[in-house]
Amino acid sequence: MLLQKSLAIQENAVSHLRNTLRGVRMSVDLQRFIIFAAILIALPVIAMLVPAFRPYIRKNPVITFLLGISSGFPLTLLVATMTFWLAKVGIDTATIGFAVALGIPYTIKFLWAPLVDKLHLPVLTKIFGQRRSWLFFIQALLFVSIWQLGASNPQPGDMGLFAIWALITAFLSATQDIVIDAYRIEILEEEEFAHGTATNQFGYRTGNLIAGAGTIYFASQEGLGLGWATAYGLTSFCIIPAIIGALWAGPGKFVDRFAHVEGMKPKQWLTEAVVNPFREFLTRHGAFLILGFVLLYKVGDAMGQAMLSPMIVDLGFSDLDYISANKLWGFGALIVGSALGAPFILWLGMGRALLISGLLMMFSNVMFMILAATGNSYWMMVAAICTENLTSGIGLTVFATYLSGLSSIAYTATQFALLSSFAGVGRTFMAGPAGIVAENVGWVGFWGFTVLAAIPGMVLFWLLWSKGYVVQSIHQVEAVDEKALKEPVGPLRIFGFLLVVAGLIGLLLSQPLEFANSITATFAAVLVAGGLLAWKGQPARAI
């Protein structure tokens, strides 16, 4: 009898704690929204007082904010919100793990980006132009797929239809990102480029909030209680901001390389659409140094972010402390950092901004090393998390602006998709050993290691800058000497380059896909080796 009472008391205590934490999380989400709204409202006031912030109130940065909302919401629906939903309906953890595969289209989106760059859609392209026609077409399909995803009613043992719609939604969302990124680059003027990139990040975070806390609030019985199907359907209307922005902005500065060619043969079309975007990039001076830098620039920061939560738990902080420090203080610091990134570029120039933001991100990891040595100190945790989020926000805006400036206006979609995929592979694949390092050297040693891990990226940056391959202006393509190499890249070499990229992605995927770990890794290694042989095997020549 006493045992039953004791168990009942424990169960009630656990239930009370869960309800308390749930209430705190919902309260924190509301506070995050208030902080975010306050910063967005404050920006126009600051812009009227500080010239470096003035582009924030121009038309095009406002439009990129709207584009960012539509870009940011699908991935949150597919990862954070969806896994929460599946857990609520009793799907086991192993099955929920399939969500890892939903990130694959975002990683390999450069493979079909040439179609977005060069394939004209009947009727729509003539009316709206290349970018807007693709945007409206993909968004119509995305709207339908999200409704179908919400209506597919996942249950234990009956996940087939749900998984299919989730993969379709992921593919369409990745394609929407290709279009929006290219369109953003093409509508922004030089003097508002960095600010437009920052407002795009603000919009992306807004989409995250709506698809995360908003969708759960719509669906939950503790919120509006509308159910998951209706909640997902309502969230799908987040495509509307991008439609409004695109109609307001016009067609942009898209360059149609096919305009002068009538009756183009399939081989010519494939050469122009698929081969030339990669050839144009690879024939730039310092192309492989640039790719190496893109791959490594944020590795130290990514390793740290991967192991932050385990360290916080290990140091004995409560859930409430971590939620308030990370989701509230940290979120505010991230938004402020993102807003500061654009004036940072304006004040320092692109080269110095990349250098200093990289050093600041290294310093933020030193703060966590101090936290690990200090132990359970709430305000030290707040200071470290705020420093990390502030510097990451600055670095995110600066780095995204740099990648945008590397993209040729003739092949915007393909080249930006390639660069962003490369950056994503670097952040994910290179951060993979983080847990092993932490287990072997402890938390203080681990954070010291993350500082060292950031050094190769900074060394590559120094090489790029010293050779003149990074300049102070935002548009790197126009500013850096773009003369072709003495031996232009031939088609077999481009094929070899794509094989190497595919192999690196395969090595990345071999970590989460445990069911085929060794097979995937072996096949990926073969692709890398084959790509290197193809690159070496053909004498370079023009196509």
What kind of region is each of these model predictions?
Residues 93, 190-199, 319-320, 409-419:
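Loop-to-transmembrane helix entry/capping segments in MFS-fold secondary transporters
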Residues 175-188, 394-408:
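Intracellular juxtamembrane helix-capping segments at the cytosolic ends
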Residues 136-155, 360-375:
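C-terminal ends and interior cores of transmembrane alpha-helices
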Residues 46-103, 288-293, 297, 301-311:
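Helix-loop boundary and gating motifs at the non-cytosolic
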Residues 7, 20-58, 150-164, 175-176, ...:
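Intracellular loop-helix junctions on the cytosolic face of multi-pass helical membrane proteins
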Residues 354-398:
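C-terminal transmembrane helical hairpin of 12-TM major facilitator-type secondary transporters
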